[in-house]
Regions:
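ATP-dependent carboxylate-amine ligase catalytic core
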Residues: 2-15, 19, 25-114, 118, ...
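A glycine-rich helix N-cap at a beta->alpha junction
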Residues: 147-149
């Protein structure tokens, strides 16, 4: 059985997703939890950092490039872990443009498929109340997605 999980995402690249991901991986690992890291999308640099922080290999979950059988086989790497954490790529809804609210292969699509709550990382430098409007906009854009914070 797959463990519960989280998706770390953001409105865009460069907002601190990797920093938050690495901090969570190391903190949970130091608490004695066996954490399975994943990267949503085709990134091959961040998974090496994930492995260093979690002491477990990180795997890519790319619903655009991988068929369902391969995605399921990769997800099976989390069997036996206490928790799975995936780091999104680009922005939460960014993927191959399709008709509808989210792009094909987006982190939102992966989070929904895995039933993982989303932690939205915001770079709020130079903002105050506007940061709340951004977070609210993301939550209302796709109300079926479970936002954890």
């Amino acid at each position: 059985m797959l463990p519960k999980g989280l998706m770390i995402s953001a409105p865009s690249s460069g907002t601190g997703k990797t920093t938050v991901m690495l901090g969570l991986l190391r903190a949970f690992s130091n608490m004695g939890l066996n954490v399975q890291p994943f990267k949503s999308g085709p990134d091959y640099i961040d998974p090496a950092f994930h492995e260093a922080a979690s002491r477990r290999p990180s795997f890519n979950l790319d619903s655009w490039a991988m068929d369902e059988a391969l995605l399921n086989a990769i997800c099976a790497q989390a069997v036996g872990a206490d928790l799975a954490i995936a780091e999104g790529s680009m922005g939460l809804f960014d993927g191959v443009a399709t008709k509808g609210a989210t792009g094909f292969g987006s982190s939102a699509e992966t989070a929904e498929r895995m039933d993982w709550p989303i932690i939205l990382v915001l770079d709020i430098s130079g903002q105050a109340q506007s940061a709340a409007a951004t977070a609210l906009g993301f939550a209302k854009y796709a109300p079926k997605l479970p936002f954890a914070g």
